[in-house]
Regions:
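Core RecA-like ATPase module of SF1/SF2 helicases and allied nucleic-acid translocases
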Residues: 3-128
Length: 128
């Protein structure tokens, strides 16, 4: 199903389908390179959101060469990597949502809504 933005004006939401054998980590690294290097989006305007602490910690450990931080910190040259619930009540211009496909969650609909409503300008969802 296509995503449609109904809030303030911004970019059309993107939904990126993983190819067979491709990891969400690989796609996220390519997205960050595109956003920061090509589109000149400041790193602190980007947040990567995952459903669990395990997933967010995995991203922090494995995103090579990219400075990351938790949402309570504010360093302008770093991308935020956080769980959806930890990021609740905050927003960033660009949200990359990933790992929602790994399992069904008790309240998937509410969790997904919380995640997608954090983007003030551009939402990118990486799906399996």
């Amino acid at each position: 199903k296509a995503l449609t933005a109904i809030g303030p004006s911004g970019r059309t939401p993107e939904r990126i389908q993983l190819k067979p054998g491709q990891s969400s980590l690989e796609v996220v690294c390519e997205l960050i390179e595109r956003l920061v290097d090509t589109e000149k989006v400041p790193a602190h305007e980007i947040a990567i959101l995952t459903p669990t602490r395990k997933h967010s910690e995995l991203f922090v450990k494995q995103i090579a060469g990219i400075e990351t931080q938790k949402s309570g910190e504010v360093e302008l040259d770093k991308i935020i990597v956080e769980t959806i619930f930890s990021f609740k009540g905050q927003e960033r211009p660009v949200i990359i949502l990933c790992e929602m496909h790994k399992q069904e969650y008790a309240d998937t609909r509410r969790l997904r809504y919380t995640a997608i409503s954090r983007a003030s300008h551009h939402l990118i969802e990486v799906i399996e």
